[in-house]
Amino acid sequence: VNYITGRRVSRIVERDGKVIGVELEPLNGQSNGKPADFIAADAVVSNCDVQRTNRDLLSAPAARSEQKSIARKYTPACSGVVLYLGLNKQYNHVSHHNFFFSKNSHEEFDDIYRKGIPARDPTMYIAAPSRSDPTQAPPGCEALYILVHTAYIRDGQKWDGPGGLMEQYKPVIMDKMRRMGFTDIDRHIVVERTLSPAGIEKMYNAEGGAIYGLASHGRMHGGFKPKNRSRVYRNLYLTGGSANPGPGTPMVMMSGVTAANCVLEDWKIPLPTEGGRSVAS
């Protein structure tokens, strides 16, 4: 196995009705007139968002058509706002994992899923990892991870920069924290980082900044995400939160196993069995 890190895939290369490998962006984004690095492959597995794979990494009209078909059937799942706070104080009322719920979940979900706006009274997940591992923060200090679900990015929404939604929404989050027992938190923040839906979209190529792939609304969509075998190319395979079986760490792991098994089946390679690889007798 050869791992190549710090390089973005610029496109999946297609020829004669199949994919033949991937092309990498130049180092530091500068080609200096040199051809792009190409990695040949008999099979390609994409763990990028399924819509982004079809729209941004493939060029065939059939891929664009498939992306539009997915967009008609599904909407992106919700996104999230993350605050990373380093504090010079500890708060004894929190454990490693903490939830602070909205007073009205119906209004919260209506804001996020129907109106497409940040929830006015959000549910918050707060992790204080130093409760389990004291080395995660200096003595007497705290490192907090704060996640608030919000709507995926709608047309015209600007999250980052002056006047953006992050600038407007962070006070809502901090106000709730003060009401949840972090009364003097503002004067104890020594390190602060934020991650917005726009940042998630850029970092992970996630459509609309969605953190759970495609939404599972409706009776059928929960169990019928896009298949692990691409409908466009027979030797292209899909995995991740927007592919079968869906989002969340356990199912994403299952998605990877399913995609790998599809490759093995299609290439007539015996599937692994517990304790070793199965072979014909």
Model segments located where?
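Active-site-proximal substrate-binding core of FAD-dependent oxidoreductases
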Residues: 14, 264-281
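Glycine- and acidic
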Residues: 80, 152-162, 238-244
